[in-house]
Amino acid sequence: MDDNLFTPAKTINFNLIGQDGNAFVLLGGWRRQARREGWSNEDINKVVDKSTSGDYNNLLSTLSAHCNMDPEDY
């Protein structure tokens, strides 16, 4: 979780695997789940801004660093 923007690391229960791979769908799903889990708009925007500051690989890397993905879902 080296890419996590928070200390201590913050994650949400969201699995990127099995989602539509469209960047907007991933961001929207991640944002909705973060809101459900009580994240502040400031923290959500921090992750979204970092996610959209580069290419698609940066998006996936940043979002996955902020997700608690269950390995059994792979």
Region locations from a protein language model:
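Long, contiguous binding/interaction regions
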Residues: 1-74
